[in-house]
Amino acid sequence: MSVCIYRGGYQMVRKSGVGKALEHQAAALKSAGLPLIDQIPPAGPEAKECVVHLNTVLPSAPLAAARAHARGCKVVYYGHSTMEDFRNSFFGSNLLAPLFKRWLIFCYRQGDVVITPSVYSRRILMGYKIGKPIYTLSNGIDTGFFHPDPARGARFRDRYGLAEGQKCVISVGHWMVRKGLPDFVELARRMPEVRFIWFGQTDEALLTDEIRKAMEAAPGNVLFAGYVGAEDLCDAYCGADAFAFLSHEETEGIVVLEALACGIPTIVRDIPVYANWLEDGKSVYKAANVNQFEAKLRDMLNGHLPSLKEGGMAVAEARSLGQIGQALCRIYASGGFLDAAMTAPAADTHTARKRA
C-alpha cells in the first residue's frame, strides 16, 4: 500500500493551516511506516493499493479525485473548511458563503471517506448531508519541533527588543475579523504597558474595511509582524508571556496545538470547537468577550492564575504525529483500504464513523 498526498495548489495554501496539515499528514504517515509517493499512479496494481489524500477545495482537487478513482485509487478528502469558518474571512466572503457551502459539499462527496479535525467540525459536515463516512482526527502537532526551549525564547525577545520583565502577548493568524484581530487591537489599547505582536498576514486586496480601520488605528504597542517561518514562530511561543487566540470560528486551530506544545500560557475564545478537548482552567483559559480576555490576561501576566503548562502539553502530546499516523492506519482499515492486521494496537483513535 502507498499514499499520495496530492499537492496541487500547495503554494496557494502553504502559509495557512491547510498547508501545515498537509505537511503533518506526510510526517504522520512516515512515522507509521507507510510509503509516500509523489504522483497518482497509472491504472494497474499499484493504483489499486494507493490512497490519495486531498486537502484543498481548489478546482484541481475534485479533478484529481476523479482521476484517482478512474485509475482505481481510494480517496481520502480532508474537511478542513466549512461555510461557517469561511464567513467573516475576507471582502465579500459573507455574500459568497452559501455558494461556497455547495462547492464544499460537491468536493467532499468526491472522497471515499472524509476526515475532519474536530468533533465540532464533524457535526457541521454531518449537517451537510455529504453521504460519505466522516471521521474525526486531529491535524496533529510535531512535538519534536514544538517544545519549550529557553534559548529559543531568549532569541525571540532579543529579536523584538523586549526588555527583561517586559510582558508580551502574541497571536497568530490571517488578518480577518473571524480571527479576532479587532479584539486583539482593543486589548492592546486597554493594556498599553504590554507589547502585543500578531504573526500572519492576508493579501491587502482581500481585507475588509473593519480590518483596515482596526489596523490603521492600532496603538503603538501593537506590532503586525507579518508571516514568519516555523523557526521564528516557535521562538515566539517559547519567549512570549501569553498566547491569545481570539478566533470566533475554527475547525481545530493548529496554532493552538503549537502554543500548547511549547508550554506558553494560552487563552482562547470560548467557542464550540474547543468544548470536547480543551478544558477551561486545566489546559487553557477561556474567555467569551474582550472584557473577559482583558481580565484573565492581566491575571495570567501577573501570576494570579495557576500555570496550566503541564495540562496544555499533555493535550498536544496526545495529538503528536506518531499518534496521528497510527490513527490514520485505523481509519484506512475501517474504510477497507488496509488490512486490519497491519494496523497498530488501538489507542485513542479520535475517530468516529457514521454516514452523513
What function would you assign to each model-found segment?
Residues 280-291, 298-305:
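Conserved acidic donor-binding segment of nucleotide-sugar-dependent glycosyltransferases
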Residues 120, 140:
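Carbohydrate-associated surface elements
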Residues 248:
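Aromatic "clamp/platform" in nucleotide-sugar-dependent glycosyltransferases that forms part
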Residues 208-231:
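Nucleotide-activated donor-binding/catalytic signature segment of Leloir-type glycosyltransferases, i.e.
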Residues 95-114:
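Membrane-proximal helix-turn-helix segments that form the acceptor-binding/catalytic region
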Residues 172, 195-210:
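Glycosyltransferase donor-sugar binding loop
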Residues 265-268:
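Short hydrophobic beta-strand element within catalytic cores of glycosyltransferases
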Residues 108, 227-228, 235-240:
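Short alpha-helical donor nucleotide-sugar binding micro-motif in glycosyltransferases
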